[in-house]
Design a protein with these regions (language model features):
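Short flexible coil/turn linkers enriched for glycine and charged/polar residues
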Residues: 13, 39-42, 91-94, 102-105, ...
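N-terminal membrane-anchoring/stem segments of glycan-assembly enzymes
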Residues: 158-247
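An alpha-helical, amphipathic repeat domain used for nucleic-acid recognition
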Residues: 1-42, 49-72
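Polyanionic, low-complexity intrinsically disordered segments
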Residues: 46-131
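Active-site cores of enzymes that catalyze phosphoryl transfer or operate on phosphate-rich substrates
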Residues: 48, 109, 225-232, 314, ...
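Internal catalytic domains of large membrane-associated glycosyltransferases
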Residues: 236-373
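Extended, hydrophilic extramembrane loops/domains of integral membrane proteins
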Residues: 124-164
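Short, surface-exposed amphipathic charged segments that create phosphate/polyanion-binding patches used
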Residues: 88-90, 150-158, 324-331
């Protein structure tokens, strides 16, 4: 989504001029958007959306005119569901593109960013991965329409992936099957030893059990003692605000917020998210709601949330837990980094920037940071 040509295109009017001439933004807003796009290092269209100057439908309609491509509102013109293929789901997600119809032998793909979609197709073909056939063309549609279409079309597959992918790929890290045979044997031996000890020498057994428990709690005390100087050093590190990255160097950051029957705290959460000091066009915020949680969904729609905040509706299935909800939404994450907030969290405004800076300073073995909320 930018003032960049796609393959084979001729010169065209800049996107900003299309928006201005159509009366969608003023000259002053265009200047603001151009400044923001330069400061954030994002395409103009993303800056216009993030600043709230136009609606997604208006922007993508203008983008279609800018690129001389048809615009499709998938809510009014639903795609031909017979064209969807389960083996292409990874492509649809990576390219943010969905099949709409056939025009003769040509497959029409709807996407908010045809340049990215074309690049993903080329990359997947080079790697021998599933991708659309050679004869295809692009149409423009809103990004959220693509995501909602995929969620409706592949509900069962997405649920399965959220619930069972870890168990299928790395069962040793999954709790779905409970204790492994080895773990069960260890706990069984311990239980049997304690039982025999109680029967044969209750006094000695009590001493041994108390000693083991004492050592266990002593280890926690030592850990807390070591954490104090480490925490003080980390606090000093957090205060080095001058080391924070510039806005143009920041990556896209995904924020997952799982919610269930928490409509009353949504306004506070929305204010906390708005206070974040991070380029709006580089935020990928997902409010994760259960599809049957009508009160929370209604409140979220009433709040007039920004375009970088998406509602992800998780179809009802067991287990109904926030980890499963996060797994479901993670399939649509766009960020290089991911953070999980709870509904009541009030993160400090510069928390995301500080996390990016700390990851940059840390080694590759650091995959997760804990932050105050």
């Amino acid at each position: 989504m930018a003032d960049r040509p796609v393959a084979g295109d001729t010169l065209r009017q800049p996107l900003g001029a299309v928006l201005r001439d159509a009366g969608l933004i003023s000259e002053q807003q265009l200047v603001q958007a151009l400044d923001a796009a330069a400061a954030w290092d994002v395409p103009l269209g993303q800056a216009v959306l993030a600043l709230g100057f136009v609606s997604p439908q208006a922007l993508y309609g203008a983008l279609a005119r800018h690129l001389h491509l048809p615009f499709i509102d998938v809510l009014k013109t639903p795609p031909d569901t017979r064209l969807f293929k389960a083996e292409h789901l990874d492509f649809y997600q990576a390219a943010e593109a969905i099949p709409i119809r056939r025009e003769g032998t040509r497959l029409v793909l709807a996407t908010p960013d045809p340049l990215m979609a074309a690049r993903v197709i080329a990359e997947r073909r080079a790697l021998g991965l599933a991708a659309p056939e050679d004869d295809f063309s692009f149409a423009i549609t809103a990004r959220l329409d693509v995501l909602w279409t995929l969620q409706r079309q592949f509900e069962t597959v997405l649920q399965h992936r959220a619930r069972l992918t870890l168990d299928e790929r790395q069962p040793e890290f999954s709790a779905r099957s409970g204790l492994t045979p080895a773990q069960g044997m260890v706990f069984g031996v311990i239980a049997m030893a304690v039982l025999i000890g109680v029967m044969a020498a209750p006094g000695l057994t009590a001493v041994v059990v108390n000693t083991v428990l004492g050592l266990f709690f002593l280890a926690f005390l030592i850990l807390r003692g070591v954490s104090i100087p480490v925490g003080l050093a980390a606090q000093a590190l957090r205060q080095r605000d001058h080391d924070l990255p510039e806005d143009q160097d920041l990556p896209v950051y995904t924020i997952l917020v799982p919610l269930y029957q928490e409509a009353e705290v949504l306004p506070l959460l929305a204010r906390a998210l708005r206070r974040l000091d991070y380029p709006r066009a580089k935020l990928d915020i997902k409010l994760i709601l259960e599809a049957d949680d009508r009160d929370t969904i209604a409140m979220a729609k009433q709040l007039g949330l920004e375009t970088y905040v998406e509602l992800v509706l998780v179809p009802p299935s067991q287990p109904r837990t926030k980890p499963k909800a996060c797994n479901y939404a993670l399939q649509f994450a766009r960020g290089d980094y991911v953070v999980i907030f709870d509904a009541e969290d009030q993160p400090e405004p510069q928390q995301l920037k500080k996390a990016v800076a700390m990851f940059a300073r840390a080694g590759p073995e650091i995959a997760c940071l804990q932050a105050p909320l």
